[in-house]
């Protein structure tokens, strides 16, 4: 009986200090999400090799460190990612402990049936959604998906068809929460307005590309997420592995390795070198050599409910990523990082400014007519 009121032990790492996903999704998730794009060996030609044993070791390390949220997609590694994650959860008897997120939209059968024969295995339409979820449930060896994302907006299905079809899956219990990835803010806003106006399930989380070098999120995505109470799950936070310190790049060259990424050559671009040097400087101020930890800490400092996706194939990289959770950047450090590559917010923010409720500053136009305090 005394154990009933006994305080919980501290988590093994800060990864185990869970957070509520968003205002519209009360599920508790780890502050970093393990990305499943590298889990599998079908794409080894451009992502590096990872066999099943290595994948299970990485998944074990993530879970043992306190992580509970894993992100994948129907098409990753020609379906191996979902299959291996499903096998891992089943072999460890951990399905109920894991928050699994997957995606539909991508053509996940082209490799099997051939080009031109897989048209209805992709897209945002109801048929694509139906077969994708059917197959994802089988591959993941589960009865439900915690978070289902639209992988990207294909402009070929109406918002009404998409949101109605997704809501049916939620009603059936096959999906619990909805997310959207790589989609214009106006589409997400229209979709969430339609959903909430018609008693349907809205999107609770947005996933997209965001890092200190690519800050397009700040134009419309972050304000949209703030308005609808959505979480943000940025990918490419580490620049696709291209944010590397000078020391790390020299080590790679010594070992005969280049940068292995989706895009870009084996060498860093001039901008990547500059931002890597800036990240290295801030890392030294925090007593670490991990550039990636600073890159993760940066996006976490920019908005509420930010859950960065972390990838990679090595446990040592996972440990570096977890280190970010103990780092809090100062306003001066954030300002320094952002000064390396100036960001143009574009019109209309360049004219009217940002939301004064967030910035605590009046817009340039309003300040000419009124004096307003922001004490609340």
From Swiss-Prot:
Q: Which residues form the active site?
A: 76 (proton donor)
Marked site (Lowers pKa of active site Tyr) residue numbers:
103
Alphabetical keyword list: NADP, Oxidoreductase
* InterPro entries per the UniProt record, alphabetical: AKR_Detox_Biosynth, NADP_OxRdtase_dom, NADP_OxRdtase_dom_sf
Q: Name one Pfam family in it.
A: Aldo_ket_red
Q: Which CDD domains match?
A: AKR_AKR9A3_9B1-4 (cd19147)
Cite a single GO BP annotation.
aldehyde metabolic process
Amino-acid positions noted as binding substrate in the UniProt annotation, renumbered to this chain: 151
Residues that, per the record, bind NADP(+):
236-246
The EC number on file is 1.1.1.-
Q: What class of enzyme is it?
A: oxidoreductase
Q: Example GO molecular function term? A: aryl-alcohol dehydrogenase (NADP+) activity
Q: Which PANTHER family match?
A: ARYL-ALCOHOL DEHYDROGENASE AAD10-RELATED, NADH-SPECIFIC METHYLGLYOXAL REDUCTASE-RELATED
Report the family membership: Belongs to the aldo/keto reductase family. Aldo/keto reductase 2 subfamily.
Q: What is this protein called?
A: Putative aryl-alcohol dehydrogenase AAD14
Question: To which species is this protein native?
Answer: Saccharomyces cerevisiae (strain ATCC 204508 / S288c)
């Amino acid at each position: 009986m005394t154990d009933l009121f006994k305080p919980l032990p501290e988590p093994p790492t800060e990864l185990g200090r869970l957070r509520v996903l968003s205002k519209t999704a009360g599920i508790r998730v780890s502050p970093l999400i393990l990305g499943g794009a590298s889990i599998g060996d079908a794409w080894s030609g451009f992502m590096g090799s990872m066999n099943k044993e290595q994948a299970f070791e990485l998944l074990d390390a993530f879970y043992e460190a306190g992580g509970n949220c894993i992100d994948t997609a129907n098409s990753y590694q020609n379906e191996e990612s979902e299959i291996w994650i499903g096998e891992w959860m089943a072999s460890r008897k951990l399905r109920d402990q894991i928050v699994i997120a997957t995606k539909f939209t991508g053509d996940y059968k082209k490799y099997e049936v051939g080009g031109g024969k897989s048209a209805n295995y992709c897209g945002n339409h109801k048929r694509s959604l139906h077969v994708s979820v059917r197959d994802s449930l089988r591959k993941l060896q589960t009865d439900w998906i915690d978070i289902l994302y639209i992988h990207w907006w294909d402009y070929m299905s109406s918002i009404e068809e998409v949101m109605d079809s997704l809501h049916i899956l939620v009603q059936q219990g096959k999906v619990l929460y909805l997310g959207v990835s790589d989609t214009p803010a106006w589409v997400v806003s229209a979709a969430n307005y339609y959903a909430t106006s018609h008693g349907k399930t809205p999107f609770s989380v947005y996933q997209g590309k965001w890092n200190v070098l690519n800050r397009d999120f700040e134009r419309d995505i972050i304000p949209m997420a703030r308005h609808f109470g959505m979480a943000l799950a940025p990918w490419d936070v580490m620049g696709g592995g291209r944010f590397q310190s000078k020391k790390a790049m020299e080590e790679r060259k010594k070992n005969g390795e280049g940068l292995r990424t989706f895009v870009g050559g084996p060498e860093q671009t001039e901008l990547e070198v500059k931002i890597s040097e800036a990240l290295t400087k801030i890392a030294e101020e925090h007593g670490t050599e991990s550039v990636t930890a600073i890159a993760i800490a940066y996006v976490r400092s920019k908005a509420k409910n930010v859950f960065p996706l972390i990838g990679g194939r090595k446990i040592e990289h996972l440990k570096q990523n977890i280190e970010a959770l103990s780092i809090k950047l100062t306003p001066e450090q954030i300002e320094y990082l952002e000064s390396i590559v100036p960001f143009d917010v574009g019109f209309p923010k360049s004219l009217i400014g940002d939301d004064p409720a967030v910035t605590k500053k009046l817009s340039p136009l309003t300040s000419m007519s009124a004096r307003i305090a922001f004490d609340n």
